[in-house]
């Protein structure tokens, strides 16, 4: 690499961020709980535009996607040992391929981040409004109003400094991951003898390797943002050490969570694509909801979670 480790970059902060802080940046941006709830159905293939996906073998698709993510993480880690700048990927590409390509990559990457965050804020605003209306019959704000409130809240947190924002991400990520992981473990324990290695066998995919690799394409989306710790290199006391550790640790954490989540969403619905499709919009909610709420996940007599959650009738796992 052409850049020197001592390259003189303008600093944004006073190097107060710890390793947990920069890990929180990557994990928080990646949003493993959100992705587990709404992106995994794409990996399975029940809501993908092509109609293809890993199917029952979706966990295998996630594992293969993780291999590529680890390779990318190694590249980012290698560059971060040499270049300690807030531009991260922009600076890496500029160093390797020149300013013109780096500028294009920077606009594409950070433009994509802005579009992604805008979309998420709109989605969350709509979800909050819809949930309050349907569950509590109240609607204090329209969906766009909640989006404005959330945007203002994020702005306030950022105003007080990156250390506050990363700590907030750390707390929120830990709480949400612990809760969801506990649910995953609960379902796996309740599955008992119904647990199987079937989701890790290529033959479990209805479309064979074609479907599995379609699942890989969507599986990569699960990891979007895992490399963003590199943006905080200027604000860490030892970026050569802490950024590579943060990036690779995030990749490991994400892989474990997503493989378990995908397995639970496949096994919890009785290894049945038809059943997964019936709850594709929000599979984790369906899997954990009581039968009186109309849940389809894990119902029935002998396969999948079948009575492991709040779902006790026999209509689902018989499919």
Predicted feature residues:
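Structural signal for membrane-spanning alpha-helices in multi-pass inner-membrane proteins
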Residues: 73, 154-158, 180-187, 262-266, ...
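Transmembrane helix-loop junctions in multi-pass membrane proteins
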Residues: 36-42, 46-49, 157-163, 310-319
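Transmembrane alpha-helical segments of multi-pass small-molecule transport proteins
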Residues: 60-64, 132-162, 180-184, 306-311
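Loop-to-transmembrane helix boundary motifs in multi-pass membrane proteins
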Residues: 99, 114, 144-148, 237-255, ...
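Extracellular loop-to-transmembrane helix junctions
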Residues: 32-138, 253, 260
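Short, Lys/Arg-rich, polar N-terminal cytosolic tail immediately upstream
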Residues: 1-16
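Helix-loop-helix junctions that connect adjacent transmembrane segments
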Residues: 12-13, 55-59, 135-145, 170-294
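Membrane-water interface regions at transmembrane-helix termini and the short interhelical loops
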Residues: 13, 79-82, 104, 130, ...
């Amino acid at each position: 690499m052409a850049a020197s480790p001592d390259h003189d970059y303008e600093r944004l902060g006073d190097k107060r961020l710890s390793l947990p802080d920069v890990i929180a940046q990557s994990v928080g941006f990646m949003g493993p709980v959100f992705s587990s709830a709404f992106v995994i159905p794409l990996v399975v293939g029940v809501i993908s535009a092509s109609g293809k996906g890993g199917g029952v073998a979706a966990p295998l698709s996630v594992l293969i996607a993780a291999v590529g993510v680890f390779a990318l993480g190694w590249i980012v880690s290698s560059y971060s040992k040499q270049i300690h700048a807030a531009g991260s990927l922009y600076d890496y590409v500029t160093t390797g391929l020149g300013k013109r390509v780096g500028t294009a990559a920077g606009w594409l990457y950070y433009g994509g981040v802005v579009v992604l965050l805008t979309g998420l804020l709109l989605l969350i605003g709509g979800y909050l409004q819809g949930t309050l209306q349907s569950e509590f019959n109240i609607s204090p704000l329209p969906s766009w109003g909640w989006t404005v409130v959330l945007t203002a809240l994020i702005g306030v947190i950022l105003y007080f400094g990156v250390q506050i924002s990363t700590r907030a991400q750390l707390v929120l990520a830990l709480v949400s991951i612990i809760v969801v992981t506990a649910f995953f473990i609960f379902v796996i324990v309740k599955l008992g003898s119904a647990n199987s290695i079937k989701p890790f066998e290529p033959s479990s995919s209805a479309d064979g390797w074609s479907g599995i690799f379609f699942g890989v394409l969507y599986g990569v989306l699960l990891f979007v943002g895992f490399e963003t710790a590199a943006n905080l290199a200027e604000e860490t006391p030892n970026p050569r050490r802490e950024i590579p550790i943060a990036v690779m640790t995030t990749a490991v954490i994400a892989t474990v969570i997503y493989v378990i989540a995908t397995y639970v969403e496949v096994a919890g619905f009785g290894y049945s694509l038809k059943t997964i499709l019936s709850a594709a919009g929000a599979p984790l909610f369906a899997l954990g909801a009581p039968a009186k709420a109309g849940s389809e996940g894990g119902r029935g007599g002998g396969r999948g979670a079948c009575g492991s959650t709040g779902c006790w009738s026999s209509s689902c796992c018989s499919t």
